[in-house]
Amino acid sequence: REKIGVMFGCFDYSTRAQLADGTTEKIGKIVDNKMDVEVLSYDPDTDRIVPRKVVNWFNNGPAEQLLQFTVEKSGGNGRARFAATPNHLIRTPGGWTEAGDLIAGDRVLAAEPHRLSDQQFQIVLGSLMGDGTLSPDPRGRNGVRFRMGHGADRVDYLEWKTALLGNIKHSTGENAEGARFVDFTPLPELAELRRAVYLGDDGRKFISEEYLKALTPLALAIWYMDDGSLTVRSEGLQQGTAGGSGRIEICVEAMTEGSRIRLRDHLRDTHGLDVRLRQAGAGGKAVLVFSTAATAEFQELVAPYMAPSMEYKLLPRFRGQSRVVPQFVEPTQRLVPARILDVHVEPHTRSMNRYDIEVEGNHNYFVDGVMVHNSPETTTGGKALKFYASVRIDVRRIETLKDGTEAVGNRTRAKIVKNKVSPP
């Protein structure tokens, strides 16, 4: 008595594999012609998407059933499509998962262009703590829209920030009061950041410990310029107050209560700043108040990253130090989670043949942007038990749940696969 061997699934003829030159080709054509091509493949050692040779081709005959997947993506018509056998392994945030165990709403890993440099990502982080927002792509694509907006008296500052993001497509708008807004093209690389920051339904921003640890002085400067104010106590004319003195207040009303406390503690513990929270004005808005000494220390930290039009928020001795220049990078393909929009059984056609390829080294490739396992190997199984009494519920990890970037749990799905008295 032998266990049933396992074959790791296949795709229909028309499923398009992504080639190393950026084009796509039907997997059936690659197999039938044994095309000597390189495909895109994920290298887990370098965390990069790289070209790899196809080293074997498989036509595994007719399939009993094929599942048609539709997955969100940022380019083209906003949809990735492929058809796979139910046992083909698809990469998800939680690991490899059989196609038949995935449903609409689950997320898979897909290759999407990343356009932001490290400097530009810091601008986004700082802006989100201030006046910036992230919103879903209005057309339902994989990506979120970053928006910056300021009043008519701060247009120069908005233009300075926009220039630092100058290689990202954007549009500008203006309201009746003269406030100006800049909306950037949806960026898939910011989707996880949006999920981490907008956790609740009240619109307040959740700033985690990991978010705070990622902040550089540039991000802190953006946050201060967006939402901070300086009350000058002394212009520095007296010998005892040379260089001037004052107190900073930064509004944190848009953050959750816990985020405000984490931010206060971060500034204290990481930068040694004497800051406290208080309620300001008739509306009782939450603000962070800096002591006179902390104000000087903070301004020394952020002075090299201030926009020229915002130097009025600096004490006189810290002005004129700005040295920020745009830092652009070429787009690179990176893995991001993408939501499954639809899964259904493909209607039977005259040709239901199953196709697959073997990829050198990494043993994975991409079909219309979605990461899948290559499947040449089979297992012969071995001796089977009369009854599978030890396995009655199949529990699979679907994805990792995060608080910011910290893993706090797993999303799982349980499926009854055998009862304790059923033979194999």
Swiss-Prot record:
Alphabetized GO MF terms: ATP binding; ATP-dependent activity, acting on DNA; endonuclease activity; single-stranded DNA binding
SMART domains associated with the record: HintC (SM00305), HintN (SM00306)
Matches recorded under PROSITE patterns: INTEIN_C_TER, INTEIN_N_TER, RECA_1, RECA_3
BP GO terms, sorted: DNA recombination; DNA repair; intein-mediated protein splicing; SOS response
Post-translational modification: This protein undergoes a protein self splicing that involves a post-translational excision of the intervening region (intein) followed by peptide ligation.
UniProt keywords, alphabetically: ATP-binding, Autocatalytic cleavage, Cytoplasm, DNA damage, DNA recombination, DNA repair, DNA-binding, Nucleotide-binding, Protein splicing, SOS response
Family annotation (PANTHER family): MITOCHONDRIAL DNA REPAIR PROTEIN RECA HOMOLOG-RELATED, RECA
Protein's job: Can catalyze the hydrolysis of ATP in the presence of single-stranded DNA, the ATP-dependent uptake of single-stranded DNA by duplex DNA, and the ATP-dependent hybridization of homologous single-stranded DNAs. It interacts with LexA causing its activation and leading to its autocatalytic cleavage.
Organism: Mycolicibacterium thermoresistibile (strain ATCC 19527 / DSM 44167 / CIP 105390 / JCM 6362 / NCTC 10409 / 316)
Top-level taxon: Bacteria
Protein name from the UniProt record: Protein RecA
Gene that specifies this protein: recA
GO cellular component: cytosol
Subcellular compartments: Cytoplasm
Main subcellular localisation: cytoplasm
Cited Gene3D superfamilies: Hedgehog/Intein (Hint) domain (2.170.16.10), Homing endonucleases (3.10.28.10), P-loop containing nucleotide triphosphate hydrolases (3.40.50.300)
Record family assignment: Belongs to the RecA family.
InterPro entries assigned: DNA_recomb/repair_RecA, DNA_recomb/repair_RecA_CS, Hint_dom_C, Hint_dom_N, Hint_dom_sf, Homing_endonucl, Intein_C, Intein_N
